[in-house]
Design a protein with these regions (language model features):
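Peripheral, non-AAA+ core regions of ATP-driven protein-machinery
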Residues: 1-149
Length: 149
């Protein structure tokens, strides 16, 4: 899935190696144990923000594994991630729609429940994450702004 706009891609393609490059991120367990690739979608949004020089909203949090097709996949430990976001002062959390069953349990015990100061939104794909997180110029949607291949 290539989401980089043509003008930015042209700048990046001025590198050698037949104008081909890719980004591969490996997050080994190391000193801090991790339970799966929960940061995949957040890392993808951060890289796109950096490469395209589009700022992100700093009042949001995001979790979800990202597939090679740009789908946001379910993760473990959603309850602690939502609780952590709320405790950190986050206003809006995005999480995989495939974790909807987990979110229903969380919504039963969130105190106070979701309101203008805190909400959780389920997402299916990277475009929904980009639409929520990035301050995309010209009031365009991610689908309009980013080049699809």
């Amino acid at each position: 899935l290539n989401l980089i706009p043509k003008d930015i891609l042209e700048k990046l393609e001025n590198v050698e190696d037949n104008n081909k490059f890719g980004i591969h991120i490996h997050c080994p367990e190391g000193a801090t144990p991790k339970d799966g690739p929960s940061a995949g979608t957040a890392i993808t949004v951060a890289i796109i923000s950096l490469l395209c020089e589009i700022p992100v909203l700093n009042t949001m949090a995001l979790t979800g594994e990202i597939s090679l097709n740009g789908n946001v996949m379910p993760i473990g430990g959603l309850e602690s991630k939502v609780d952590g976001g709320k405790a950190a002062g986050v206003k809006h959390v995005l999480c995989p729609i495939k974790n909807e069953k987990d979110l229903k349990k969380i919504r039963k015990r969130i105190n106070p429940p979701e309101d203008d100061n805190f909400k959780v939104t389920m997402i299916e794909n990277i475009y929904q994450a980009l639409n929520s997180f990035l301050l995309i110029p010209d009031n365009k949607t991610a689908e309009e702004y980013f080049r699809k291949i």
